[in-house]
Amino acid sequence: MSSRIDRDVINALIAGHFADPFSVLGMHQTQAGLEVRALLPDATDVWVIEPKTGRKVGKLECLDARGFFCGVLPRRKNFFRYQLAVTWHGQQNLIDDPYRFGPLIQEMDAWLLSEGTHLRPYETLGAHADTMDGVTGTRFSVWAPNARRVSVVGQFNYWDGRRHPMRLRKESGIWELFIPGAHNGQLYKFELLDANGNLRIKADPYAFEAQMRPETASMICGLPEKVTPSEERQKANQFDAPISIYEVHLGSWRRHTDNNFWLSYRELADQLVPYAKWMGFTHLELLPVNEHPFDGSWGYQPTGLYAPTRRFGTRDDFRYFINAAHAAGLNVILDWVPGHFPSDEFSLAEFDGTHLYEHSDPREGYHQDWNTLIYNYGRREVSNYLVGNALYWMERFGIDALRVDAVASMIYRDYSRKEGEWIPNEFGGRENLEAIEFLRNTNRIIGEQVPGAVSMAEESTDFAGVTRPPETGGLGFWFKWNLGWMHDTLDYMKLDPVYRQYHHDKLTFGMLYNHTENFVLPLSHDEVVHGKKSILDRMPGDAWQKFANLRAYYGWMWAFPGKKLLFMGNEFAQGREWNHDASLDWHLLEGGDNWHHGVQRLVRDLNHTYRHHKALHELDFDAYGFEWLVVDDNERSVLIFVRRDKAGNEIIVASNFTPVPRHDYRFGINQPGRWREILNTDSMHYHGSNTGNGGVVHSDEIESHGRQHSLNLTLPPLATIWLMREGE
């Protein structure tokens, strides 16, 4: 005889409106004795089984035809391990009862999660294969403090929200449940009765794998093993290291020619990685690989921050790709988007019926430029979710650096907003103080937890101290994209050479602020889309002049202080804009040797020469590493400077940005002796006119530009040359 269960409780449980299933289901000590209760829709017969002997201990009575069973076990007083023999559609199945297991999340973890100080929340939240009390299965947990009820639905329960309602840990707002038999590879979601009584089906914010779009389910997947960064990888990120970044969109670098389908992670490991190594790049930067529903977002509107996109393969395939890059001596940078997320119903938006991850006021929580939602960084659990994600990619995949997207949109409340469309901070200012603190905290934790890992900021304003320590008012990034340099130099290069003399300062201005931050010089994906034209097509003149201008510009860029970044396709001067739905124009490199081969060879030589000579990279962020030799010859559009290493070795860089060769061009130098031309962008090897200095030039004891010794050079048309001192 079972104890009396309130009919309203049974109805609420079956209807999915009951918040505390563990208070009813499972094994309970009652006045009637030891009682077992189970909600098993469509079952016709249920027995309690003792696992050791397989003996039937007692039969459960069907109290409701919709699947509620209950029974008192005779001669049993103490709790024990049990299983249920359940008959469905005439077939008996032996199952473990999810409601016989105790709380899953340890009190310390729950406290840290609530405080927002759990360094690795992904180790607790989400779906994790586990063995409990000798039973294999998966433990699920999700943060949804305002939901009235949360269930796990998936392939293991016919996507039926009645079958696996979860336990609420009220102190943290986390719902949890261990489901015996649920295993890796199975799909799942969370079904929530939200704060307003509406039903929502949500993907797991902490899912390690997800379905291929347009499907949106999460996939049970084990946590990857930790990756220990090698000493070589750590050194490759240092300020004095040569850093030349090849920025890549994995879906359009190259495609299968027969069906225009993407290459897989493993195919990219076999093709992209050796190509980048051959080209001499030191780093691969990947446009976001987090799962995202819309191809046209390029990954910048992610819905699965913890899941590599299935477009190119599995999570393990992605790890294979990263391992291949590391084996080839390439560090991997991941574009990371902690600034906003899309409003898709299956994702984070109004997760539990409230504005849980985003701000409730659209003046704070809605990004009108991208039709996305903005994270509420002031909510500890939200910041914890994001900080944990940064560590996840670095520790579990071996990502060497994160490039943080759209930092300006995060740190300014009035970003892209008119007056009246934004809310000031507590001091009446425009800064988003919570976002600033989040970025500082993220960078601090990266520095403490992942030796050698770094972060880079795409920050488009003049916010002071992006790469300075937080204790001095900075954001704590290691590097910042120099978007000002990029805009100024491209504006200069697109001018007809006749008019460049009037805009000389666009090339010199960058040095006035160059040492305020640790800069990366970016020619990124943003510069070859939306009608901006390709980098090649921005160059003025006929075809010969376009290619000559581009080569001269690359020679200038690779010698200028700052780390280098080049988006794919620019290394061989693709003529059209980037199209994310198609392969790069590799056909331009087919057939006989041409101008595109010339640019490709130049970029390869730039990379290898840049890496070989410390003067070109060792003191990028030290004033001693750079000195103007000729800065004011605007009439002839000539600029000459010195790069210097710690030992004082110099490389001279001279650029002529007109199509007129400058013969007998004399300028003063610091170190007399024999100088060799080690790179000339006008060389015949790059399909230039082959004007130059015949290899070696000797200095003269003739005063020039305030220096006792000087060189007399021929400066090729629309070209940059590099010279290295060989001796006295």
Swiss-Prot record:
Record EC number: 2.4.1.18
Swiss-Prot/TrEMBL keywords: Carbohydrate metabolism, Glycogen biosynthesis, Glycogen metabolism, Glycosyltransferase, Transferase
Gene3D superfamilies according to UniProt: Glycosidases (3.20.20.80), Golgi alpha-mannosidase II (2.60.40.1180), Immunoglobulins (2.60.40.10)
Biological-process GO terms, alphabetical: glycogen biosynthetic process
Pathway: Glycan biosynthesis; glycogen biosynthesis
InterPro entries, per database record: A-amylase/branching_C, Branching_enzy, GlgB, GlgB_N, GlgB_N_E_set_prok, Glyco_hydro_13_cat_dom, Glyco_hydro_13_N, Glyco_hydro_b
Superkingdom, natural source: Bacteria
Residues the record marks as active site: 405 (nucleophile), 458 (proton donor)
Family annotation (NCBIfam families): branching_enzym (TIGR01515), PRK05402.1 (NF003811), PRK12313.1 (NF008967)
Protein name stated in the entry: 1,4-alpha-glucan branching enzyme GlgB
Organism for this UniProt entry: Salmonella paratyphi B (strain ATCC BAA-1250 / SPB7)
Gene of this entry: glgB
